[in-house]
Amino acid sequence: LCLETGGVRLQEANLGLAAIADIHAAIVDLRRYTPVVGIVAGTVGCFGGMSIAAALCSYLIVTREARLGLNGPQVIEQEAGIEEYDSRDRPFIWSMTGGEVRYESGLVDALVGDGVNAVKAAMNDAIAKGVPAKHRTDNYDDYLNRLTNFDTRKQADAEQIKALFARE
């Protein structure tokens, strides 16, 4: 699945949410039988309900240019304020949601170069691995525990995010 999307538009309302839910259910059903490989490779990134679809994939491949998060930078800035999250600060945005930090924090399986051949090779490697014994989302209790114990009183930085979700 090539996942380059800002998510459902607010004007799509319940119809958009239902479509996303159908996609989620299809991924969960399919991944029992064959690896479902997600790829985020462009500058649009993957946000909203489709970022959940990305997390449901058996394997997730990103490039350095990719971004992955539940809410996009503009949405966070609108809700939290520019002092909290400046969507124009590209180094900050990529330090929090970019492909490299998502890989280093264990939320994706492969970080590859920005080219068709690199992405294709990683996709073929993921398919060759077959269905994982345990999917990332099967570890929800571990992620919930980590988030519950995280101090949210101050703005997190990339190093804290990497430490919070460090690969074990």
Spans of model-derived segments:
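Conserved catalytic cores of soluble enzyme domains
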Residues: G7-K134
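Substrate-binding cleft of extracellular glycoside hydrolase catalytic domains
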Residues: E4
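Intrinsically disordered, low-complexity segments enriched in small/flexible residues
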Residues: A121-E168
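Glycine-rich beta-alpha loop segments
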Residues: L1
